[in-house]
Amino acid sequence: MAKKVAIILADEFEDIELTSPKEALENAGFETEVIGDTANHEVVGKHGEKVTVDVSIADAKPENYDALLIPGGFSPDHLRGDEEGRYGTFAKYFTKNDVPTFAICHGPLVLVDTDDLKGRTITGVINVRKDLSNAGANVVDESVVVDNNIVTSRVPDDLDDFNREIVKKLEA
């Protein structure tokens, strides 16, 4: 049975930060499911990419997934704005249980809500690094950072490195 990757997503995601890792994962034989506010609802990226939500966050069970992917753009801000904190709680399952967790650009902001960044080494786009540092993370400026189960990258230019490392992590 193929490993399954949860992708948490809201409107205004950075299109290529969803499509490129999703394609890399699927080409490597992994299954992906998009999780958002409402199943069968369409979310739209910053550049017009349209994606249908497979599973609502209300119905998603983190234990049913082998990894978590959090694309960047403005989507992470919307996810963090969930009044019930469901996306942070969902992500916390992965960080707390050492399940592979992948985040790029603004995506690592969702990990702030897990309260599990203290002492972890991660990266993200420059304008989120202070928030990550304030959450206790050791923030570095590298194209891809692997800290145990967490893989992070900064920007779309880092996608080749990011995709290589997330596939490698799931193949291990």
Swiss-Prot record:
Q: Where are the transmembrane segments?
A: none
The cross-references to SUPFAM superfamilies, in alphabetical order and at most eight, read: Class I glutamine amidotransferase-like
Write down the superkingdom of origin.
Bacteria
Q: Return the PROSITE patterns for the record.
A: PEPTIDASE_C56_PFPI
Domain PfpI endopeptidase, residue spans:
3-171
What InterPro entries does UniProt report for this protein, alphabetically? C56_PfpI-like (IPR006286), Class_I_gatase-like (IPR029062), DJ-1/PfpI (IPR002818)
Record-stated family = Belongs to the peptidase C56 family.
Quote the protein name from its UniProt record: Uncharacterized protein SERP1413
Its taxonomic placement starts with:
Bacteria, Bacillati, Bacillota, Bacilli, Bacillales
